[in-house]
């Protein structure tokens, strides 16, 4: 079982749709975590997105970072954090299964493609209430368990 998703009871209703995504915890030189908000949405989340059919998580993440932030990161710069599941922030009756990576952000970035806003999060401060469930309930606790990122 993946972190975050309850086991299904034998006679329970069918499970909701699950999207396969890849996302990155990108840290600036001050140790702050980069968050993004897509157009016409409320919740902040990690940069990344849906995997295309047949696409591995790392390739999907590199493609999404280029599209969303015009950021090119080599595969070796992205370290795996883990695989997590949570309710999707912006799609009803949907879960996300996410491969999460972390890396240092090599330079400043600007929102592109469908991104509306960027925000920096100091992970030592209280968690804001406008974070996606995956980030709030799964990724932030996992980051706190790392020796250092």
Predicted features and spans:
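Active-site-adjacent beta-strand/loop module that shapes the phosphate/pyrophosphate-binding cleft
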Residues: 84-110
